[in-house]
Design a protein with these regions (language model features):
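C-terminal motif of bacterial Sec signal peptides marking the signal peptidase cleavage site
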Residues: 17-18
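Gly/Ser/Thr-rich loop/hinge elements
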Residues: 149-201, 237-243, 247, 254-258, ...
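Terminal peptide-recognition signature
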Residues: 30, 71, 110, 142, ...
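Sec-dependent signal peptide recognition
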Residues: 2-9
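STAS-typified acidic loop motif
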Residues: 99-123
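A short, well-ordered alpha-helical element
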Residues: 118-138
Length: 290
C-alpha cells in the first residue's frame, strides 16, 4: 500500500514538472518567434518585456498563454493575437458574402466585402466583379465600408483594372517587398485585363480594416482617386501565423503597409480625403463633375 502511494506521488510530481516544462517551452518558443519577427520587437520596452516573460514559471497552460499575450502586444501591436487550436482546425466555409457591381449611368458601383474563402472561391469573388465591368466607364465607386479584411489578393485582383503597377510595399524590420498587379493576379490565378481609365471614388468607414485597408492603399497617390467617408480601423499591417505546440497559432504582425507615395501605415487609422456621413452621395456627385 505504501509502495503504491509512493508511486502515485512520484507520478504526480513528474506530471507536474512535465507540465511546468511544457508551459515554459510554450512561452520560450513564442518569445523566440516574437524576438526574431515581431515588427516592434526592438528597443528597451521589448527587452524588458522579453526578460519578464522568460523569468516567469507558469504552472498552467492558461498562465503561459496570458504571458505570451502580454508580450505579443508589445512585439506585434494591436493587430497580433493568438488563434485558439479549435479555430485553426475549423474548415473554411462558404458563408462569406459575394461582391456586387451596379451600373448607374456609366458609373460602376463596386461593393467589396471581406473575404476568407479558399482558392476557388477567391477566383469566383474576382470574376464576379470582372465579368460585370464594361470596358468603358465614366467613373467607379469602390465601397470598402465594412470590409474588415481577410485575404487581400482577391479584393485587389477584383479591381485591378483601375490600378497601374507598383501597388504598394510590405516593410518588415529588415527589408521591404513590392506588390504589383502581376504578383496579385498570379497568386489568385486570374488573367490580367485591360486597364479602365476613369476617376475612382473609394468609400471607407471605421470597419474598413487590414486587407480592406491594403486594398485602399493600392489607390493612394493616384491623381484620379478620391476617398470619402470616415477614418478606417487602423490595422494596415502584415500578419503571419506561426504554429504553436498546443495546436494554436501565434498570429504576429511582422510588417507595415507602404503606399506608392512612400507613406507608411500600420496602427493608425487612414483618414479619407472627404470626411462625410454621406459618402455615396458625395462620391457620385464628385464623379459626375470629373
Amino acid at each position: 500500500m505504501r509502495y503504491t502511494k509512493i508511486v502515485l506521488l512520484l507520478t504526480a510530481v513528474l506530471l507536474f514538472v512535465a507540465c511546468g516544462d511544457a508551459n515554459e517551452r510554450y512561452v520560450r518558443k513564442a518569445v523566440y518567434i516574437m524576438d526574431h519577427h515581431g515588427l516592434y520587437a526592438q528597443g528597451e520596452q521589448w527587452k524588458a518585456t522579453k526578460k519578464a516573460a522568460l523569468a516567469e514559471h507558469p504552472t498552467t497552460h492558461e498562465e503561459a498563454v496570458q504571458i505570451v499575450q502580454q508580450a505579443l502586444q508589445v512585439a506585434g501591436g494591436k493587430h497580433s493575437f493568438i488563434m485558439p487550436a479549435d479555430m485553426v482546425t475549423v474548415n473554411v466555409t462558404s458563408e462569406w458574402e459575394m461582391p456586387s457591381v451596379e451600373l448607374r449611368d456609366g458609373i460602376a458601383v463596386i461593393y467589396l466585402p471581406p473575404f476568407s474563402g479558399n482558392d476557388d472561391e477567391g477566383r469566383r469573388y474576382v470574376q464576379t466583379v470582372l465579368d460585370a465591368l464594361p470596358d468603358t466607364l465614366s467613373g467607379a465607386v469602390i465601397d470598402l465600408r465594412g470590409n474588415s479584411g481577410g485575404n487581400m489578393y482577391p479584393m485587389i485582383a477584383a479591381v485591378h483594372r483601375f490600378l497601374p503597377d507598383d501597388l504598394l510595399r510590405f516593410r518588415n524590420r529588415k527589408n521591404s517587398m513590392p506588390v504589383d498587379n502581376d504578383y496579385i493576379l498570379n497568386v489568385v490565378g486570374i488573367a490580367r485585363q485591360a486597364m479602365i481609365d476613369c476617376p475612382v471614388a473609394i468609400l471607407t468607414n471605421e470597419l474598413t480594416a487590414s486587407s480592406g485597408e491594403a486594398t485602399l492603399l493600392c489607390f493612394r497617390g493616384l491623381q484620379n482617386v478620391r476617398v470619402f467617408g470616415t477614418p478606417t480601423a487602423g490595422y494596415a499591417s502584415s500578419n503571419v501565423p506561426y504554429p504553436m505546440p498546443d495546436g494554436s497559432q501565434l498570429v504576429l504582425t511582422v510588417g507595415s503597409d507602404v503606399a506608392r507615395t512612400g507613406e507608411e501605415f500600420c496602427d493608425a487609422p487612414i483618414v479619407p480625403d472627404s470626411l462625410t456621413e454621406s459618402p455615396m452621395e458625395e462620391a457620385i456627385a464628385w464623379l459626375l463633375k470629373q
